[in-house]
Amino acid sequence: GIVSTVNNGVRSDVYSKSVRTDSALGQALGAEALDPTESTNFSLGLTYSPFKNFNLAVDAYRIELKDRIASTAGLTGTGINNILAANGFSNVNYVTYYANLFDTETNGVDVVADYTQQLNKYGRIRWSLGFNWNETDITAIADNPSQLDGINIDRITHRTKGMITDADPK
């Protein structure tokens, strides 16, 4: 992809590349074939109707993911530039690839309440209120490949972790 920015009136293009794990460039960056993500889900749900036209539902859940697939951080620097150039990509500023980077655990609660108000000849109104809370924690992080360790590049950064725990849908 290409991103253009203008700074002090000068246009600056940034070229990025997302590579396949089975490509020569992917292999040079330490990419490996992707394993399927495995999930285990535990949940408990309760419903309660304390009076006519009112319902309350509470669901609690835990989702454990093993070998979660995510994008690496944008890999850049002299060592990366050398790998890119050796594979015919001298005009690329940074590169990413997908990998089994994390094991995660998500815990959450959903609460839904609804009440149906009868308006006689005018019909009815159904009032509904919902609440959700969830939190994702990283329980394991994949090792950095030796190809990147050798040039002091980490494929997982604080931002990469934040995309999993705070930004991605849970």
Where are these regions (language model features)?
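Gram-negative outer-membrane beta-barrel transporters
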Residues: 57-170
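Outer-membrane beta-barrel signature, preferentially recognizing the C-terminal barrel domain
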Residues: 1-57, 64, 89-109, 114-118, ...
